[in-house]
Amino acid sequence: MEIHPSLVVEPSYPDLIIHAGEVTLGEKDRNKMDSKKKRLEKARITEAACALLNSGGGVIVMQMSNKSEHPVEMGLDLETSLRELIPSSDLQAFIETKQQGDLFYIFVKSWSCSPKDGSTKPRICSLSSSLYCRSLTSKLPLDSKETFEFLERKKTCVKGSLTDGKGPPAKIPRLMYQNDLESNPAFEIFQSERLEYGQRLPFSESASIEFKQFSTRRAHEYIKSVIPEYISAFANTQGGYLLFGVDDESKRVLGCPKDNVDRDSLKAVVNEAISKLPVFHFCSSKEKVSYKTRVIDVFKEGNLYGYLCVIKVERFCCAVFSEAPISWMADKENGVYSLNTEKWVRMMVDIGPEAASSKQSSLDDLSKDFECQLSLSNSPPHCRPVYSKKGLEHKGDLQKRLFQVSADCFKYTPESLWRELCSQHERLENLISQQMCSFSCGLLILSRSWAVDLNLEGKQGVICDALLIAENSPPTLYTILEEQDELGQDYCTRTAFTLKQKLVNTGGYTGRVCVMTKVLCLSSQNNIETNGNSVSLIDYPRSYNLANIQEMEDLLQALVIVLLNFSSFLSDQLGCEILNLLTVQQYEILSKSLHKTRKLFVHGMPGSGKTIIAMKIMEKIKNTFHCERDSILYICENQLLRDFIRAKNVCRAVTRKTFMTPNFEVEKIQHIIVDEAQNFRTENGDWYMKAKRITQRMKTCPQIFWIFLDYFQTSHQKESGLPDFLHQYPKEELTKVVRNADKIAEFLQKISEKIRSNPPPIIPRESLNMVCEFNWSQGVSGTCKLLTSLGLEQMARYVAERCYFFLKNGYSAQDIAVLFSTEDEKDNNEDMFLREIRNRTSQIDDAYHLYMFDSIRRFSGLERSIVFGIDPRTAEKSIFHNLMLCLASRARKHLYILSKVPNPFNF
């Protein structure tokens, strides 16, 4: 990454503002300029525009060196440069200009590859791709569209060969290309030991042959300058021969005089120049450019005169660049910076989920079980694809539920928070109403901290933040302070900037957008705004106002993605980040005020997303209370779930047993999240009272104690340590199952009703009434099979056959769990099952099988696409159905329960 030396990103605005220094504007004045200065100014402006197009949009600010009282145009060379930068016929769709005094502004909208004209477009903008190809006798640079198509062809070629072979991405065979080169007429010259000065070659330049003459004494520098573009062109086409020392008109051998070069230095210069060429592989190869160099003696009148240098270049499997592509990005941490070759290619064609051909099963699951909410083919460069489970609400439906916009109606939302804030601060309603009096259509979306909602640190002294989304107005973020605070504007600016960036780069908003800021102080006698920098110093064009309800809804749908997104389990399987969306039920729990809800019991049905909410709430705790990682403690019962959470690095994660050891360090702990609490025990002491004491030590500082549990998944009959159900207050419920396929969810519902009708004595009956609200996201196909009256060897063979089927069809061992009733049964039978599987496939190595076999209890809280339950049973018959529920809910897509007895469930 190279930082731009002369472009400066302004840190104190809620937008990306790039200062480009002094620039001469106007066609007449620019034509009078020194050519070098003119070229440097054009480069600065184009590079700044490139950075903003690729980074979510923003503003270029220029100081006009030629003062003018009258409006001036940019200048034709600047307009042409910007038009060439943007791979779109409509420059004005992305660029607007405005002059204010001696400042000139270029307003840049984020690039998006939306193919409105029906053509495919690159994901990012670039000044140069540094990719070349041969066309007849010329080397041609590829423009943005050609580059995108070239890279897409290469990617598709590898993907096609991979899909056919069902294996890892293979190297593309080189033999056929080598045969072509050896049948080339230049091959005979390449094989020669000596040539005569003035000898006429029996062939001319072509798509695979290029002549270059040594016309300078600086032969080494000349070769270095020629090689990058020509080698890139040959390698990216069909390969070819580059001959140094031939006159391209007469086709006569001239060579390079031996007084200017020697044989070894010629080879060294060629090797050095080619070794520096960047390459990118879509396939598994790691090879650089394949070439051979021959330095051939040239004789004149019987004496050695000099040398002819011939480079034979083979066609490259993927892409060869003459240098790193020239493309820029910007952020407030690094300023304006260039992209390296690998990142540029990955962003250019965006190697998203569709490129994960080796994970065909996961791709199938994605296409069959999820609905796309945000596609890479119609979004800004930094966006990740967003999918929702089939049967869950679309982003448009979520927007209407959370942020409904109505014509001729202005609303404060959420209403409950608005009423609560007004009751707590008597002057607040009047203060905000004064600001809103001119708006008749839109929303004021209130939050105790928009910063925390955006995963930033909150700020003490902020009563609330309010986001205005209104007709004929740009989005505006209001921060209301209790007392005057000089850092209030910084907080508001930082929050507004993050919101604007996330609306584009996460939410996929493709319209023009800025977020204005206003800081109000409740204690001010005149209800005036606080002092501080304001983005209003830049007068944005009217096109940045939300013109109508449709534009407001588009922006609010992007906001829904910003607020409700979380990383999907498919991200790890596909090797690229994919986002899912929370349900409204999950979001409402997550939106609770932590200052008011210091303690909460969250009861959730199996597969309703309890652990996701636990992770998200820990992130919110960190930002609300400015916590270090070790201040937040996550406690669960089993080690696998502990390890899963620990890897997220948001908290300190331990098991209950570790938490209850006498020497467990609690000094730094301020907040505690308990997960899977129904399976906790008191054999090592009263964990609940210990956690409660820790989170009540500091009366002046709020400390959080949230407990997630599901009595339906209780897997023992011992005392859990939880308070009586009636004393579990406040309490929230998660009743929508979002994990499992339809047939598995139906099975879960049946077992849940069975448990409710005949609960184990240890479970409070009232806790099971939530099964009446049980529902799931329907539309996901899957398998739920019960096979009975089988012996263990039959089970092992069946599991092996199904594993072979799934592995052959693109699943991996990481997608499969084989669960036994107890750890002893797992230890006793694992080898037999593993042996049967390995007899059929070689895809199970030692690293994978460690995570493939486990006990039902130890696997609690985790999930897999495919789950086999091996002869599930319990010593305590009263909790048999609970254990079955725990087993079945682990399976996302395919569930197989294999039993020795004829009818284990009595359905």
UniProtKB/Swiss-Prot annotation:
Resulting phenotype, C283A: Renders the protein insoluble
Q: List the molecular function annotations (GO) for this entry.
A: ATP binding; ATP hydrolysis activity; RNA endonuclease activity; tRNA binding; zinc ion binding
Q: Where is this region: N'-domain region?
A: 1-353
- What happens after mutating H281A? Renders the protein insoluble
Q: Which InterPro entries does this UniProt record tie to the protein?
A: P-loop_NTPase (IPR027417), Poxin-SLFN/SLFN_N (IPR031450), Schlafen (IPR029684), Schlafen_AlbA_2_dom (IPR007421), Schlafen_AlbA_2_dom_sf (IPR038461), SLFN_3-like_DNA/RNA_helicase (IPR018647), SLFN_GTPase-like (IPR048729)
| Chief place where the protein resides | cytoplasm
Q: What is the effect of changing E229A?
A: Reduced endoribonuclease activity
EC number per UniProt: 3.1.-.-
What does the UniProt entry list as the effect of changing R39A?
Reduced endoribonuclease activity
Q: Where in the cell is it found?
A: Cytoplasm
Gene3D superfamilies given in the database record: P-loop containing nucleotide triphosphate hydrolases, Schlafen, AAA domain
The effect annotated for K224A is: Reduced endoribonuclease activity
Its biological purpose is as follows: Endoribonuclease that cleaves tRNAs and rRNAs. Cleaves tRNAs 11 nucleotides from the 3'-terminus at the acceptor stem. Does not act on tRNA(Sec).
**What's the protein called, per UniProt?**
Schlafen family member 13
